[in-house]
Amino acid sequence: MKRFIPHTLLLAAALLTGGVRATAQMKTAYFMEGSVQRLDLNAALVPQRGYAAIPGMGNVGVEANSNFLSMRNFLYPAPDGDGLVTFLHGSVGNREFLRRMRRNNHLEINVRENLLGFGGYARRYFWSFGLNLRSESSINLPKDLFSLLKRLEPGQYDLKGTDITSDNYLEMAMGFAFPIRILTKEVTIGFRAKGLLGLAHASVHIDGMDIDLNDREWRADLRGSVNANVAGMNFSDLRGRIELQDVMDRLDPSDIDLNRIGSWGLAFDLGAETRFLDDRLKVSLGLNDLGFVCWSKKCGVGGTLSDLSFAYSGYDFDREELSTSTPDEIMLDIAPARNRTRMLKATLNVGGEYNILDERIGFGLLWQTRFASSFTSTELTASANFRPSPWFTASLSHSLLQNRLGVFGFALNVHPSWINFFLGMDYIGLRYGKYSDIATIPIGMKAINLHFGLSVPITKPKADGFKAATRARLHRRR
C-alpha cells in the first residue's frame, strides 16, 4: 500500500507532464496567421484562405492543466544523491512537501475534436462552420488529503471540498467575421454562435469527509451528492435508497431512447483585432465559450450520499493488503429529477504582436484568463513567430506564470495551396529526472497539451475586403 499511493500519483503526474491547460486551445498558435486553429482562440482571427477540414482531423486537441500536479512536487533528490525519492520518503520533511500544495488543488483535462468544419470568404465576410465533440473534466482535491498521505499520524482530517465533474457535449458553431472602420482605424470583428447538445454529465461533490486516525484504526464518515445525466438513458424508475452500482448498471448503449435526448445549450464567441504603427503592431481581444448547458431531467438522476461510514482496523501500510471492515455497497438516496444548468468555462484572450522585416518575424504576448465555476486561472505567454515563406509559419513560446524556466512551446503550420497541416504543444520540458524503474520523466511542468490539425484550402481571399493588405504583402514576397 505504501508503494501504491505514490506510484498512483506519479503515474498521474507523468501523464500530465510527459504526454497529454485546459481549454483545449493552442496558445502558441494565436499569432500564426495561416492556421485554422486561431478561430478557436479569437473569432476575428480568420485564416488566410478558406478551408475544408478533413473529417475528424481538422482540429484535435488534448490538454491537461493543474496548479499542483508536477513531478517536482512529488519527487525529491535522494539523500545519497543517486536519483529521486517520493514525497513519502523519510528524508522529505512534512513542511517541505505540504508548502507546495494549495488549499484547493485543481486538475483539468479537456479534449476537443473537430468532426466537420469549413470556412471561406464571401465578399467582405469570412464564414465558418464547425461540428465539434468536446469533453471538459475537472478534479478538486483539498490540502488535507495530501497531509493525510504524508503524515499518517493520529488525528482528524477534513476532506470536504473534494469534487469531480465531467461535461461532454456536441458543439455546432456558425461564425462570421467582417471589417469595420472606427474613426481612422480598420477593426476586424468576429462572432460565433454555438448550439450545444448535451451528451453526458457527471459530478460528485463531497460536502464532508471526516477521517479520524488513531493507533488502532482509522474511520471515515462521508456526506455528499452525486448527479449524472446521459443522453437517451431512462432513470425515472429509480427511487428511494438504492445501490450506486444500480445506477451504473443502467448505462447500456442498447437502451438509448431518442425521446430522452433533451439536454441543450447556447454559447457565443466574440473577437476583435486592429493594427497600429503602419500595421506593425496588432492588438486583439477574444472572449470564448460565453454560455451554458441545460441538462434535462428526462435523462438525469441524482441523489445524496449520507450515513456512509467505513473503518480500517489493524492496518499496516507496508503490506499489500489491509484488514478492513467496510460497507458492502455504497447507498444513494435518490432525489427528484430536475433540470440542471451549468455555465461553460469562459476564456478571455488579450493579445499583442509587434512585427519586423515585413512581418517575417513577430514578437507576441498573450494574456489568457480562464473562468471556471470554483476558480480562475491566468496565464501569460510570450512568443516569437517566424514566417519565412507565405506557406510556412513556426512559433516558439514560453508561458511565464504557470510553468518554470525550461518549459517552452512550439507550433508548426505548413499551408501551401493544397494542404494545411498544424502540429503544436504549449508545454515541452527541458528538465528531466530518473525515478526507480520508471523511464526518464520531465520535472517542473504543471500542464501539457498536444494539438493536431489537417485541412484542405478551398478558396483565397477576394481582392477587396479586410485581408487586402495581407494579400498585398504576400504577393510582394512571391
Task: Please give the residue ranges for each predicted region.
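Bacterial Sec-dependent N-terminal signal peptides
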Residues: 1-27, 352
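Subset of outer-membrane beta-barrel
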Residues: 25-478
